[in-house]
Amino acid sequence: MGIQDRPYYRPDARTPPAYARASGWSATTWIIAICVAVFVIDGFLPWTNEPVASQLMPGASAEQIRQIDRSEFALTKPVDVAPGVARGYAVLGRDNVVAEVEYRKERPLTRIGYFSTARAVYASDPVLGVSGFEVWRFVTFQFLHANLNHVLFNMMTLFFFGGMVENFLGKKRYVAFYLLCGVAGALMYLILNGLAIGGQAAFGPSFHLPGLLFNDPNTMLVGASAGVFGVIMAAAYLAPNATVLLFFVI
């Protein structure tokens, strides 16, 4: 008898191929797999420098700068000045330095997908121009994470609570619910940050109201926390008296 004819080498009709098993994964498993894959892939990609703000040099007028075509500016190569931060200059002509440009070091996937008030809504810079209306960021930021602990605890929590909610809602409604919770989290961040920025614009830098987010509009927001928190609340509503074993033992 050849080795291929032995019983334990024959394909079992009851065992689906790997691709079929993957297509049968739960939505929770898919979300966890995507978040982990994005985190790992992004971690192997090289850092990039993204210009986020400029500071005009003394004597330069923002109104005059805005009237100049941006193609006439040349940005010098940024130089690292602190962990995660680099600086360069905007030059007009051969040696007319008009502004100092601040850069933030980011991974490529994070740069494409992170959420911020400036990127999602609107921001105007005399040197860098207008940005905003990047609505995809309301979804993509949910699949990005800042570090290993961030992705680990979010995915572990989703693993414990996601199955219960998915079984109740079904796969499609569960995915919609999860993503909408993340979008709601981004909208709440946007409202609190927008109110803080608007308050300081109206009443001056001394304006302060507890609960508002006095962050720079370029501050990055990443993570699945809003969607995961929504899943936790749904699980608590569906099974308020359920016992959850932390790490399967406690």
Can you say where each PLM-predicted feature lies in the sequence?
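A detector for small-residue-rich transmembrane helices and their helix-helix packing motifs
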Residues: G2-I250
